[in-house]
From Swiss-Prot:
SUPFAM superfamilies: EPT/RTPC-like. GO terms for cellular component: cytoplasm. This is UDP-N-acetylglucosamine 1-carboxyvinyltransferase. GO terms for biological process: cell division; cell wall organization; peptidoglycan biosynthetic process; regulation of cell shape; UDP-N-acetylgalactosamine biosynthetic process. One of its GO terms (molecular function) is UDP-N-acetylglucosamine 1-carboxyvinyltransferase activity. UDP-N-acetyl-alpha-D-glucosamine binds at residues 93, 307, 329. It comes from the Bacteria. HAMAP family: MurA. It comes from Nitrosococcus oceani (strain ATCC 19707 / BCRC 17464 / JCM 30415 / NCIMB 11848 / C-107). The lineage of its organism: Bacteria, Pseudomonadati, Pseudomonadota, Gammaproteobacteria, Chromatiales. Pathway: Cell wall biogenesis; peptidoglycan biosynthesis. The gene is murA.
Amino acid sequence: MDKLLINGGISLNGEIRISGAKNAALPILAATLLASEPVKICNIPHLHDITTTMELLGRMGAQLMVDEHLNIEVDTRNLKEFYAPYELVKTMRASILVLGPLLARYGRADVSLPGGCAIGSRPVNLHIHGLQAMGATITVEEGYICARSQGRLRGTRLFMDRVSVTGTENLMMAATLAEGTTFIENAAREPEVVDLAHCLNQMGARISGMGSDTLVIEGVDSLGGASHTVLPDRIETGTYLVAGALTGGRVKLKNTSPGSLEAVLLKLEEAGAEINTGKDWIVLDMKGRRPRAVDIRTAPYPAFPTDMQAQFTTLNIVAEGSGTITETVFENRFMHVQELQRMGAVIRLEGNTAFTNGVETLTGAPVMATDLRASASLVLAGLVAKGVTAVDRIYHVDRGYECIEEKLQQLGAKIRRVSSYTPGKIYAAYG
């Protein structure tokens, strides 16, 4: 099993290019199931979850082609299967996004209850209840969601009991081919939801209200082909900005979208970073200074993103002063704390809040990732720690970060991927 070895204590400097957003690319891949013509997707990140989704589409009978620029064209005109098997779905939560498109276009779908990161309950009830309100018959049998529709789904008014990104996306996709108009209230406002809506509209859908908490979808008879460029990954952007901040460095990130990161940029400035932005770039400069601790409270967009909580936990544990980090979106999302404590972090957990007291130095140690963003926080800790940190189970980080070690190397980090190591001899890795 691969690991990352990191020799910390180096100030990061340089520039890198940000990849396309995984959380936009995955629903857009699912949306190709709605199209009666091929759909081309550009700026798609090459990650394990993307590969898994492509394999799932291929098993259903879709034809997928990758061009010389690594863009993907998906043709779902000759689908033969309407089934998402457990052996694929168990590895990622986003696989449930095929449920709405399959049901809307083909009138049937059998999708295994999904897996993904172990960060608490992410109930699928919002998806099921919404599709039932649109006329679907749904049962859960032996771990599978079995959905059927007699004819087209029906437009209706839906109210989301809580803000759900995948729930909003699934119901929005299903509504594009429904008969009549669908209103989704308390809809997610995330940029990735907006990007999916733009792609669907390019395919011929009639969606309005993107970026607000009420989406209006006028159903159409069919959707056609399109070419769509996936928006930049705001969470990858935020992660590398934190890397620059906690190492006292200066980093420039290109091919990104500053407007989607306002809450994160404000907190980085509060931590002492100097930030400049352009249309598609961000420069962060800490000028060799130690960051100041900040208080964070996660909430749905446009508030501070839950997917940046773990990274800011790492920032706080090496910052001047004390800070509090409150998680309101998911429960059980502080599993990185125990591993950070092994490196010398001073953190106290009380319910859904972490209280941090910054220390001047972390110590490198073998640590184990438990989920995608927790793994990123451990890599960040390794960058600033004294000595060598070995991060195990990095298949988690590979689910969301394209070429993470290569990009960090471009910024000057001493980091490399290994297939095995001897714990007592990890300091020889960079001898």
